[in-house]
Amino acid sequence: MNIENKEITSSWFTNLRDLLCKEFEKIEEEYAQTKGLKPAKFVRSSWQRNGGGGGVMSLMKGAVFEKVGVNISTVFGKISPEFRNEIPGAELDGKFFATGISLVAHLKSPLIPAMHFNTRYIETSKSWFGGGGDLTPFYPEKNETVKFHAAFKEACDKYDSSYYPKFKKQCDEYFYLKHRKEPRGVGGIFYDYLNNGNFEQDFAFTQDVGKALLSVYPEIVRSKLFLPWTAEQKEYQLIRRGRYVEFNLLYDRGTKFGLMTDGNVEAILMSLPPEVKFN
């Protein structure tokens, strides 16, 4: 396993965490100042994995972000024999290294979309990058969806013109609730097992995916920060959040990988919304 690659990827995910948390706290401050409220701040808690490594959870519950969590983790060790065939390159000895960032934002306003993002670097006897970002509006707006996709398309096109259509398709297929026969949201991009034989290029792309999210999502949140919403709209948001829960518990690879590698359960399930209704 390449020590330098592990160090620079882990360092980037920490840096991106700091940038995202700073921007989200800034949004909370902007809203709080107009309402005479005390702005919310992220609360951080670290955890250690018994088999090796650990992570830091950053959680904020505020007036804008009902619940937003930004997790970073760097874990290593051996995958249990019963799960080794599910992770490429882990079949023989089960050794693995994984570092990454995951972010889920659930907003108080039903007019502001929920958002999920993660990027990661994994080494077994093989190595690869994966991740992506997707948007889940409860009241979709075309221009908002176009803006979100355009940010990721720009990041993709910088490296390969085939990336965006391929990764968009993979996102649409991945974030699909088969039992409901419906998509979870309006998509974005999703990629996995990315290894073009050029670590520097694949890493630079993964960094640009993070920068794309940082450029577009705060803008979307701010555009609807002060729009009024009704009790009926909030009720609909809570019901639709149920789909989020269903996907994460039934299909999400990150959830499965975290549980297979004895990750921190609180961090793994951080993506679940704070309040939800099932009808």
Swiss-Prot record:
Its job: Involved in the heme biosynthesis. Catalyzes the aerobic oxidative decarboxylation of propionate groups of rings A and B of coproporphyrinogen-III to yield the vinyl groups in protoporphyrinogen-IX.
**What biological-process terms (Gene Ontology) are attached?**
protoporphyrinogen IX biosynthetic process
- Pathway the protein acts in: Porphyrin-containing compound metabolism; protoporphyrin-IX biosynthesis; protoporphyrinogen-IX from coproporphyrinogen-III (O2 route): step 1/1
Q: Where is this site: Important for dimerization?
A: 179
Q: Which cofactor does it need?
A: a divalent metal cation
The UniProt subunit note reads as follows: Homodimer.
Xref: PROSITE patterns? COPROGEN_OXIDASE
The protein in question is named Oxygen-dependent coproporphyrinogen-III oxidase
Q: Which residues bind a divalent metal cation?
A: 106, 116, 149, 179
The record ties this protein, via InterPro entries, to:
Coprogen_oxidase_aer, Coprogen_oxidase_aer_sf, Coprogen_oxidase_CS
Can you state which reaction this protein catalyses? coproporphyrinogen III + O2 + 2 H(+) = protoporphyrinogen IX + 2 CO2 + 2 H2O
Annotated residues for binding of substrate = 102, 118-120
Q: Which family does it belong to?
A: Belongs to the aerobic coproporphyrinogen-III oxidase family.
Q: What is its main location?
A: cytoplasm
One cellular component GO annotation, for this chain's record? cytoplasm
Locations listed in the record: Cytoplasm
